[in-house]
């Protein structure tokens, strides 16, 4: 394993994508990146562009307005990538389920690797989901290197 591969293993880049949420989960994600929970101690960094992301956190029900944007953003994330569904909305629509503008669940449009449920989930639960995603990502990278 090269020095760069070792570094990448310990510093996953996360891209956050809101697909129409109430912002409850988004607030918890921002709290997670702040000094109280300090996700950076695990090497987690927030990516400004999906092109630099290893892990994508998706919040909110997939709305008809956000669907094409989400597909476009996900197409820019390099493989291997891990998709983390945050909150109950991406999985079920939650309170937005029967809305005329919801075109979910998220799994209808992309494979979800980790699901963090709750409305809204606590930062600790989101961090646990991210660490699970890091493990999945490292396993994928390990398989790539063995090919």
Short names for language-model regions:
Residues 1-147:
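Iron-sulfur-associated redox domains of electron-transfer enzymes in respiratory
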């Amino acid at each position: 394993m090269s020095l760069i591969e070792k570094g990448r293993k310990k510093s996953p880049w996360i891209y956050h994508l809101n697909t129409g949420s109430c912002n409850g989960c988004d607030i918890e994600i921002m709290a997670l990146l702040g000094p109280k929970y300090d996700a950076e101690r695990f090497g987690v960094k927030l990516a400004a562009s999906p092109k630099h992301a290893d892990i994508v956190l998706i919040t909110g029900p997939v709305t008809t307005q956000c669907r094409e944007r989400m597909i476009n953003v996900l197409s820019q994330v390099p493989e291997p990538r891990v998709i983390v569904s945050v909150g109950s909305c991406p999985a079920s629509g939650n309170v937005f389920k029967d809305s005329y503008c919801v075109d979910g669940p998220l799994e209808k449009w992309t494979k979800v690797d980790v699901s963090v449920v709750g409305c809204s989930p606590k930062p600790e639960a989101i961090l646990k989901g991210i660490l699970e995603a890091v493990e999945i990502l490292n396993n994928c990278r390990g398989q790539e290197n063995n090919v």
